[in-house]
Amino acid sequence: VATVDCSDYPRPDCTLEYMPLCGSDNKTYGNKCNFCNAVVDSNGTLTLSHFGKC
């Protein structure tokens, strides 16, 4: 199972760096920052499906 450490989040500003991750909601997030902010917003219900686009 792929995991991402989101302990440093949320962060107010994410870079535009493109390193896509696919969430358990079947949505592609542009980078770890965007994904981790969404994880925090979901109260931990969102998880990483896999690295790369969904």
Swiss-Prot record:
Intrachain S-S bonds: 6-36, 14-33, 22-54
Pfam families the UniProt entry points to: Kazal_1
Keyword Repeat applies: yes
One Gene Ontology cellular component: extracellular region
Domain Kazal-like: from-to ranges: 4-54
SMART domains (UniProt xref): KAZAL (SM00280)
Site positions (Reactive bond 3): 16-17
Domain of life: Eukaryota
InterPro entries: Kazal-type_SerProtInhib, Kazal_dom, Kazal_dom_sf, Prot_inh_Kazal-m
Glycosylation (residues): 43
Main location: secreted
Keywords on record: Disulfide bond, Glycoprotein, Protease inhibitor, Repeat, Secreted, Serine protease inhibitor
Location of the protein in the cell: Secreted
MF-aspect GO terms: serine-type endopeptidase inhibitor activity
Keyword Translocase: no
Domains as described in the record: Avian ovomucoid consists of three homologous, tandem Kazal family inhibitory domains.
Record protein name field: Ovomucoid
